């Protein structure tokens, strides 16, 4: 009876404990996933900023470069806190377009701009930004431009090289203003209302320094020093420092530096192989990366690498940059008149892609890329050589057979008619 009473008391206590737990809804099971992060306010949350999105691979915050096709090649976009280096083409015709697309994307998304140049006033650069293409407003014009530049062979179903139809196609088409990445009309200028409503800062080198300053060996040039101080002040004063908590709404700072490393910036790497300022550019990039890593900012730099005399400096600059994209124009080269490249204006080379929070980079399988500037659009496409449908090959083979027949002589090179060549 004592044992039964003991069991009864244990059962009663267990029942009361279950009743108490059911009333308080307390359980030892905790769900791992989005719900747990929502209920826990102290956990880290991803910053939500207009014109950005997280990477599906490493969770890094991405911004668009202004060219959705280039975003696709870079793994979804340009990561915040990184440097995009554009190797200028020989005559500096197409690289300014990528520079302006990057700035125009920032204005459309409401980002803050910092434009630095030693050649052109930043205010004049903003006046030349392309106009954005949106869904309903410019869809008709976009379709007409694509239709006018579409090759007839693109509509024909492939019978021999049918495997090319299975390749993924580059994204092309206008999108809404709320989506990630936009398209722009290169034949029109951005409305003045958008430029006036934007928040931007300009750094024009001739207005910041005088020509009488002397540069000490193994130190930064005055232009690089002034620019770093200017960028640092904007990051800390405007609230783009990610290491310190900010009370106001977060935003992205887009930094654009034009013609960096050229003699206009007071650098001599384009004039001599072993100049006195050979380490000035690499020091500047090293300090710039330190500023970007701890801030909500992204930077694009155009550099005339084809003018740099010392190739070792180019290798160091590539290492200090996160993303390196090279433009090779056909102007002035043999490929300009080559019929194989008649549909393109140049080649684009993805030389380096960053490895951020990952062991490997999100590298595209496509290596052969070309670009062309249409009436309104700057497009990046896979390089496809046209099929050889001409009769030049057959004519050349006939001429070779005729010459060989003459050398062989009438005994074995002539047929019964005496006028026909040897046919294999």
Curated annotation (Swiss-Prot):
Gene name of this polypeptide: ELP4
The cellular component terms of Gene Ontology attached to this UniProt record, alphabetical and capped at eight, are:
cytoplasm; elongator holoenzyme complex; nucleoplasm; transcription elongation factor complex
Major site of localization recorded for this protein: cytoplasm
Question: Upper taxonomic classification of the species?
Answer: Eukaryota, Metazoa, Chordata, Craniata, Vertebrata
User: Native species of this protein?
Assistant: Homo sapiens (Human)
Which pathological condition is tied to this protein? Aniridia 2: A form of aniridia, a congenital, bilateral, panocular disorder characterized by complete absence of the iris or extreme iris hypoplasia. Aniridia is not just an isolated defect in iris development but it is associated with macular and optic nerve hypoplasia, cataract, corneal changes, nystagmus. Visual acuity is generally low but is unrelated to the degree of iris hypoplasia. Glaucoma is a secondary problem causing additional visual loss over time.
Q: How does it assemble?
A: Component of the elongator complex which consists of ELP1, ELP2, ELP3, ELP4, ELP5 and ELP6.
- Please indicate if the UniProt record lists Cell membrane as a keyword: no
| Record-annotated disulphide pairs | none
A single GO molecular-function term is: phosphorylase kinase regulator activity
> Would I find Ribonucleoprotein among this entry's keywords?
no
Q: What is the recorded name of this protein?
A: Elongator complex protein 4
């Amino acid at each position: 009876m004592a044992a039964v009473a003991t069991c009864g008391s244990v059962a009663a206590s267990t029942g009361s404990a279950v009743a108490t737990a059911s009333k308080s809804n307390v359980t030892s099971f905790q769900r791992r996933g989005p719900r747990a992060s929502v209920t826990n306010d102290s956990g880290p949350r991803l910053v939500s900023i207009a014109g950005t999105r997280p990477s599906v691979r490493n969770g890094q915050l991405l911004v668009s470069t202004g060219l959705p096709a280039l975003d696709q090649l870079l793994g979804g976009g340009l990561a915040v806190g990184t440097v995009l280096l554009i190797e200028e083409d020989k005559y500096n015709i197409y690289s300014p377009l990528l520079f302006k697309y990057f700035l125009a994307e920032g204005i459309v998304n409401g980002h803050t701009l910092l434009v630095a140049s030693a050649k052109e006033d930043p205010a004049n650069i903003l006046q030349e930004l392309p106009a954005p293409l949106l869904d309903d407003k410019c869809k008709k014009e976009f379709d007409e431009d694509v239709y006018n530049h579409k090759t007839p062979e693109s509509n024909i179903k492939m019978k021999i090289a049918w495997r090319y139809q299975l390749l993924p196609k580059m994204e092309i088409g206008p999108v809404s203003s709320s989506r990630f990445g936009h398209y722009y009309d290169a034949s029109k200028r951005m409305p003045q209302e958008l430029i006036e409503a934007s928040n931007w800062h300009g750094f024009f080198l001739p207005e910041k320094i005088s020509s009488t300053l002397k540069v000490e060996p193994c130190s930064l040039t005055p232009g690089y020093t002034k620019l770093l101080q200017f960028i640092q002040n904007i990051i800390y004063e405007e609230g783009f420092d990610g290491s310190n908590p900010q009370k106001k709404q977060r935003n992205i700072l887009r930094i654009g530096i034009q013609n960096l490393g050229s003699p206009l910036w007071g650098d001599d790497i384009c004039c001599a192989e072993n100049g006195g300022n050979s380490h000035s550019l690499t020091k500047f990039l090293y300090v710039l990366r330190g500023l970007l890593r701890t801030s909500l900012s992204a930077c694009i730099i155009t550099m005339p690498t084809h003018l740099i005399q010392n190739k070792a400096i180019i290798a160091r600059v590539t290492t200090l940059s996160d993303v390196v994209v090279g433009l090779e124009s056909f102007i002035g080269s043999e490929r300009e008149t080559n019929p194989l490249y008649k549909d393109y204006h140049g080649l684009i080379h993805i030389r380096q892609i960053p490895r951020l929070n990952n062991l490997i980079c999100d590298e595209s399988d496509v290596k052969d890329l070309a670009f062309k500037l249409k009436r309104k659009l700057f497009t990046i496409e896979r390089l496809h050589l046209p099929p050889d449908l001409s009769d030049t090959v057959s004519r050349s083979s006939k001429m070779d057979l005729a010459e060989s027949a003459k050398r062989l002589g009438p005994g074995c090179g002539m047929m019964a008619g005496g006028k026909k060549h040897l046919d294999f």
